[in-house]
Amino acid sequence: LDEIHREFMQRIRPSITQMARMLVNSPRDAGDTLLMISATNEFITRPIAHALGVDELIAINLERGPGGWFTGEIAGTPSFREGKITRVGQWLAARGLDWADADATFYSDSINDLPMLEKVQRPVAANPDARLRPIALERGWPVLELFGAQP
């Protein structure tokens, strides 16, 4: 698995822009805890979080069978749509916190993250998809283009 991660990151690392690194480094340098939450499985997202220096990761956890192999099933609450709110709530509770304590900025490119964008104090649409972009603009949320102009 380590070799697969290395090969994967050789392809991904060049797409991590300087602006994306700045968006991660700035709050970290200010002492904030960085939490990456993704609807993609942990196997894929863990090396990306590590490359960015992100403190914590919430992702889809894949169930493993008795031999350690992935079963193809999801373990626990999927971190997708409203499930992201549930999983972050669990993460906060494990630290003796709740949503009232969270001073959060959340970046997303997907309409599927609308529930989380509506939950946080500072929603940001980053490379938003065609359905998220007009909502973000209508609500006055910042819209970032991390990969240059989007069609």
Specify the residue positions occupied by each region the protein language model found.
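C-terminal cap/substrate-recognition subdomain and adjoining C-terminal extension
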Residues: 2-6, 10-151
